[in-house]
Amino acid sequence: MLNTLIVGASGYAGAELVTYVNRHPHMNITALTVSAQSNDAGKLISDLHPQLKGIVELPLQPMSDISEFSPGVDVVFLATAHEVSHDLAPQFLEAGCVVFDLSGAFRVNDATFYEKYYGFTHQYPELLEQAAYGLAEWCGNKLKEANLIAVPGCYPTAAQLALKPLIDADLLDLNQWPVINATSGVSGAGRKAAISNSFCEVSLQPYGVFTHRHQPEIATHLGADVIFTPHLGNFPRGILETITCRLKSGVTQAQVAQALQQAYAHKPLVRLYDKGVPALKNVVGLPFCDIGFAVQGEHLIIVATEDNLLKGAAAQAVQCANIRFGYAETQSLI
C-alpha cells in the first residue's frame, strides 16, 4: 500500500485526486494539505466539495513544514501553484517521496522558459533534467524509473495526443504550422474568485493570444512549431480543441486513421472516432481523451476533447502513478 499525500487538495483538481486516490486499492491517503495561510485550513474536504460527503471526510491540514507530513509517505501529488511546486518538490524528493506535480514547474527542460513564461527564476536545473514528462501514452518507459513526474498541462495533453502520431508518422507538411484553436471551461482558472470568471461576466473569448505558456510546452514536446490560441468557454469544465493541419502530398485519410490506430490501439484512455468528431459532453466527468478527424484533399481537421480536470490533470496524474508503480494503467480511473 502506497502512503499518499495530496498537497493543494482544496482546489478542483485536488478534489478529483482525492476521489481517485481514495478508491485506489493500492493507495492510502495519509493527509490532505493546504497552505498555512489558506482560509480552507481546518475545513473538511467534503465541506468544500460536497460530492465527497460520506466518501472522504478528512480535514484540510495547514502545511508550513513538509517534515510534519513527509515521514512514511511514498507518493506526493502536488496540486499547487507553479512557484509552490518549484519549492516543495525538491524537499519531498529529498525526503524519499515520488512526486507527481500537476503544475508547470518542471515540464520543460529549459530554465529560461520559466523566466519568460512563468515569471520566476528556476533554481533547480538539475531537476528539470531529471523530471519525466507525464504524457502517459507516450512517455511510459521514462515514467517507470522517475521520481519526479511533471504532469502535462490540460491544453498540451489534448494537442499532443492528437498531433504526435501524425508527426511521428511523417504525415504532416510542417511548413504550414498546425493551428490549434482550443476552448476550456472556467474551472481551468481554478476556484479563486475573479470578476472575469463570474456567472454574469464570463463569455466565450480568446486569451493569451501568441503569449500563452502552453504554446511553447506543446511545441517543445512535439518537436514542431504550432499556432495555439486558447479560449475561455462559458461552461464549467472540459476542453475541445480543433486543430487544422496540412497533409503531405499524397497522404490519404486511411493513412491518418492508421497512424492514430497504431498509436492508441492499446491505450485505453484515448478513444478514437471512426466516424464524425467528438463532443465535449461525452468526456466531462471521465478520464478519456476522444479524438476524431476529417480530411479534404491535403487539409486535415482533427478534434480532441477531454475533461480539463481529469485527463488534463488529476486522471493523468494517477495514470502516471499507475505506470510508475506497475499497476493497471486505468486502476481507479474507470
Swiss-Prot record:
InterPro entries the UniProt entry points to: AGPR_AS, AGPR_type-1, NAD(P)-bd_dom_sf, NAGSA_dehydrogenase, Semialdehyde_DH_NAD-bd
Alphabetized SMART domains for the sequence: Semialdhyde_dh (SM00859)
GO biological process, one term: L-arginine biosynthetic process
KW NADP (keyword) present: yes
Main enzyme class: oxidoreductase
Keywords: Amino-acid biosynthesis, Arginine biosynthesis, Cytoplasm, NADP, Oxidoreductase
Location(s) in or outside the cell: Cytoplasm
GO molecular function per UniProt: N-acetyl-gamma-glutamyl-phosphate reductase activity; NAD binding; NADP+ binding
Active site (record annotation): C154
Main location: cytoplasm
Database matches in PROSITE patterns: ARGC (PS01224)
Pathway note: Amino-acid biosynthesis; L-arginine biosynthesis; N(2)-acetyl-L-ornithine from L-glutamate: step 3/4
Functional summary from the UniProt entry: Catalyzes the NADPH-dependent reduction of N-acetyl-5-glutamyl phosphate to yield N-acetyl-L-glutamate 5-semialdehyde.
PANTHER family, per database record: N-ACETYL-GAMMA-GLUTAMYL-PHOSPHATE REDUCTASE, CHLOROPLASTIC-RELATED, N-ACETYL-GAMMA-GLUTAMYL-PHOSPHATE REDUCTASE, CHLOROPLASTIC-RELATED-RELATED
Protein name: N-acetyl-gamma-glutamyl-phosphate reductase
